[in-house]
Structures are given as structure tokens and as C-alpha cells.
């Protein structure tokens, strides 16, 4: 499915919509996704989407969501709890904190730059999102 998100606000709002939908699914006892993988170029909207997603979860209304490029993982006290990881600076083997997060069966793990995870290390029950950006010039 292709969805056009022309600006940051529409990207945040789409994140909110999916966050609310996932929260409803959890509340109704539906299948629980524990890991969401994000693929996409630098600046394509992965963290912006994540901001809206986390804000939509109970407890996330006032969360200060930022890219965990330097910390590798940020935790948020939402319901369900969220661990937000960024593999942009990761090379080779997964850092321990990311590897441990991927093994969790409670809460949610959101991983940016998922293309840096070797195929054999990918969990089975995941959502995958690919972000693409385009710049139009000359208008």
C-alpha cells in the first residue's frame, strides 16, 4: 500500500492514526505486534512518524520523542511500553541493547534503519514500513 505523506504534520498524524489503531487492537485482545521495522533514507520521516505513533498511545501525550541515533534506544512509559531504536550508526553485529529489545515479548519495539538487521535475525511477527522521500524542484 502506498500512502502519500507530503509534510511532517501529515506524517505525524498518520503515526497517530496507526498508534490509536494498534492500541485498540491491544485493548480488544487482538493479535499483538511487538516489533515495527522502519526502512528509509535519512530524512524520509521515520522519526516523525514515530513521534505521532508514540503520542497516540496512553501515557505518550507529553513524550518528547527524538531520534535515538546516539543513544541507540529510547524508552517511553506508554501503554504498551515502547522501546525506540535507531541503527543508523550500527555496523556489523547488533548492539546488545537492540538485540535484547528484539527478543522482548511485551511492549513494542520500533526500529529505524532496520535494513541493518541481518535477515536471519529478523523476528517473525513484525510490521514493516518503508519510507521514501522525494524532492521536487523547479516549480
Regions found by a protein language model. Give the residues of each.
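The conserved Walker
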Residues: 42
Amino acid at each position: 500500500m502506498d500512502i502519500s505523506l507530503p509534510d511532517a504534520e501529515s506524517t505525524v498524524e498518520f503515526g497517530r492514526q496507526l498508534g490509536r489503531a494498534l492500541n485498540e487492537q491491544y485493548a480488544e485482545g487482538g493479535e499483538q505486534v511487538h516489533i515495527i521495522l522502519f526502512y528509509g533514507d535519512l530524512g524520509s520521516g521515520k522519526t516523525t512518524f514515530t513521534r505521532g505513533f508514540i503520542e497516540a498511545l496512553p501515557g505518550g501525550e507529553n513524550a518528547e520523542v527524538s531520534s535515538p541515533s546516539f543513544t541507540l534506544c529510547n524508552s517511553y512509559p506508554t501503554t504498551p511500553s515502547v522501546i525506540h531504536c535507531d541503527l543508523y550508526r550500527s555496523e556489523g553485529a547488533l548492539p546488545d541493547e537492540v538485540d535484547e529489545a528484539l527478543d522482548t515479548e511485551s511492549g513494542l519495539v520500533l526500529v529505524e534503519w532496520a535494513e541493518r538487521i541481518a535477515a536471519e535475525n529478523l523476528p517473525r511477527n513484525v510490521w514493516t514500513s518503508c519510507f521514501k522521500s522525494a524532492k521536487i524542484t523547479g516549480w
